[in-house]
């Protein structure tokens, strides 16, 4: 027995199991992020990616994963972390600079007192989130220009995408979600969501594993959007009672069949006529819908964009 063996601390069975589960979680999140980046061609050679960091679990995880992938990527790209200090009361201004300095990642803290603007404009008791979000978005677009960023990375995850889909469906009468990649309204910025394939439960576990210095998200005193909270509870209930159901809905977003919906802008129902030729996928009008919640839908589908350059795989 060597001296190193004697000095090495002996892990308990519980510690070994926790270490194993932590490694497995880290690899899974890296793998799913890699898949999203590849499927939607989110990051390309020479990109300068502005990683929007709020101090919450999702954006911390996004930065951590992207930094790991940056080392394994088959091409070069830059990361710069950006936080917007909106001067909310009690915001701990030292936490993020200290954390980012310890990582050695380039970062920029933008200070803009949007809190005072929102509280002055809105009546007392009104939800601040919508106006605050619009102000924040405009500032981040400006900062992206100033920093020369070619991509803006946001930390929205699978549950955020599902929540937006259901909010639009239930309260807006639209089949509209939250895309993994988009161009801003002014046509100048590409916004990406690298965590699109990751469930919130995994991000909660990852934050606990990594012990991120989380900053509370309710410092402004605004109440959480009750409708979004409602659909979030619904998805969480599904995950508990019907494993696979929420993934089925999520996967449906990339398996759209316009001929079997009702949008005349997506399919020419008006001009539809028999062609006299058989169509294997055409006559399913009387098929029974699949109702098995437990089908194999525990993760996003592969191969959405296989021609794209892929990152080194995590086994």
From Swiss-Prot:
Motif (PP-loop motif): 54-59
One Gene Ontology CC term in the entry: cytoplasm
Cofactor: Mg(2+); [4Fe-4S] cluster
Pathway participation: tRNA modification
Alphabetized GO MF terms: 4 iron, 4 sulfur cluster binding; ATP binding; magnesium ion binding; sulfurtransferase activity; tRNA binding
Catalyzed reactions: cytidine(32) in tRNA + S-sulfanyl-L-cysteinyl-[cysteine desulfurase] + AH2 + ATP = 2-thiocytidine(32) in tRNA + L-cysteinyl-[cysteine desulfurase] + A + AMP + diphosphate + H(+)
Xref: InterPro entries: Rossmann-like_a/b/a_fold, TilS/TtcA_N, tRNA_Cyd_32_2_STrfase, tRNA_thiolation_TtcA_Ctu1
Superkingdom of this protein's organism: Bacteria
Primary localisation category: cytoplasm
Cofactor notes: Binds 1 [4Fe-4S] cluster per subunit. The cluster is chelated by three Cys residues, the fourth Fe has a free coordination site that may bind a sulfur atom transferred from the persulfide of IscS.
Job of this protein: Catalyzes the ATP-dependent 2-thiolation of cytidine in position 32 of tRNA, to form 2-thiocytidine (s(2)C32). The sulfur atoms are provided by the cysteine/cysteine desulfurase (IscS) system.
PANTHER family, alphabetized: AMINOTRAN_5 DOMAIN-CONTAINING PROTEIN (PTHR43686:SF1), SULFURTRANSFERASE-RELATED (PTHR43686)
Protein name per Swiss-Prot or TrEMBL: tRNA-cytidine(32) 2-sulfurtransferase
Species of origin: Bordetella avium (strain 197N)
Protein encoded by which gene: ttcA
